[in-house]
Design a protein with these regions (language model features):
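Contiguous hydrophobic segments
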Residues: 38, 62-88, 194-218
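Solenoidal tandem-repeat scaffolds enriched in leucines and small polar residues
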Residues: 85-175, 183
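Aromatic (tryptophan-biased) beta-strands that constitute blades/sheets of beta-rich domains
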Residues: 1-3, 11-34, 65-74, 102-115, ...
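Beta-propeller blade signature
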Residues: 56-64, 149-160, 199-206
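Short beta-strand elements that form the blades of beta-propeller/WD-repeat-like
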Residues: 2-9, 14, 36-52, 56-57, ...
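Repeated scaffold domains used in trafficking and secretory/extracellular systems
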Residues: 1-2, 28-41, 72-85, 115-130, ...
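Acidic, glycine-rich loop-and-beta core segments that form the ion-binding/anion-interacting portion
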Residues: 159-214
Length: 218
C-alpha cells in the first residue's frame, strides 16, 4: 500500500501506483460517496443511501479486496475523522467512530432511531469540529442554552457503551466560533477567534495548558 494514491471520480475509487500505473479500482454506481478515510492499511468509504451517509465499506488498500461493511443511520452530509486507531464521520448533528472491524465505539449527538432514551447528553447542540487520537476524542460545539459560547468536550473513544458517551471534560470557551486545530493523546488545541485571536490548548481534564496569539482566520 505504500505510495498508493487514492482518487475518486465517476463512482469509482482508483488506487494508483507511484509509477502512474493503476493498482486497483472499486466501483459503486448505486450511491454517492460521502467521505473517504485511511486506517489499518484499509480504505474506508462511506456512501449515501436511504439511511444518509451510513453505508460504509472497508477495502484492503494494498489489493483492493473487500474487507468489511457496516450500515446504520447517519447524517446526510458528513466529513471524515480518523486516527491510527479509529475512523468515523462527523456532521453538525453527530459523530460516529469505528474500530478496525467496523464495529462502532462512539455514537454522539442527535442520534436517530435511538434504542434507549437519555443516552445522549447534548442532543440539541451543533458540532463544529472533531479530532481524535488513540483513546482521546475532542470536539467543539455550540448549544442553544448558552449562545456566544463554544464548548470543547473530551471523551473516551472506547466507552463501556457505544451509545452512551463517556465525557471526560467540558470546557466553556466564552467565544462563538472556536475550532479544533490539533489533538494529542491527552490534550487538544483550539483556535479562538476575535479581535485578538489565540490558539489555546487544554488537557483532557479540562485544564488550560497554554495560550498564544494567532493570526486572524481568513
Amino acid at each position: 500500500e505504500t505510495g498508493l494514491t487514492i482518487t475518486h471520480a465517476d463512482h469509482t475509487l482508483t488506487a494508483t501506483n507511484p509509477d502512474g500505473s493503476e493498482a486497483w479500482t472499486y466501483e459503486r454506481t448505486d450511491a454517492d460517496l460521502c467521505s473517504l478515510s485511511t486506517a489499518w492499511g484499509k480504505i474506508v468509504a462511506s456512501y449515501k443511501t436511504g439511511v444518509g451517509c451510513g453505508d460504509t465499506v472497508a477495502i484492503e488498500a494494498a489489493t483492493g479486496e473487500y474487507d468489511s461493511t457496516r450500515s446504520a443511520v447517519n447524517s446526510e452530509k458528513v466529513v471524515p475523522v480518523s486516527s491510527n486507531d479509529r475512523v468515523g464521520t462527523v456532521s453538525t448533528d453527530r459523530i460516529d467512530l469505528w474500530r478496525s472491524d467496523m464495529v462502532r465505539t462512539v455514537e454522539y449527538g442527535d442520534v436517530e432511531a435511538k434504542q434507549e432514551p437519555d443516552k445522549q447528553p447534548h442532543e440539541d447542540c451543533t458540532i463544529s469540529s472533531a479530532l481524535t487520537r488513540t483513546e482521546n476524542l475532542a470536539l467543539t460545539e455550540s448549544c442553544p442554552d448558552k449562545p456566544g459560547t463554544t464548548w470543547l468536550r473530551f471523551q473516551d473513544t472506547t466507552p463501556d457503551d457505544s451509545r452512551e458517551p463517556d465525557i471526560a471534560a467540558d470546557v466553556d470557551i466564552a467565544t462563538d466560533g472556536a475550532r479544533l486545530v490539533a489533538v494529542g493523546q491527552k490534550a487538544a488545541a483550539v483556535y479562538r477567534p476575535g479581535p485578538h485571536p489565540t490558539i489555546e490548548s487544554y488537557d483532557n481534564k479540562g485544564e488550560k495548558l497554554d495560550s498564544t496569539s494567532a493570526e486572524p482566520s481568513p
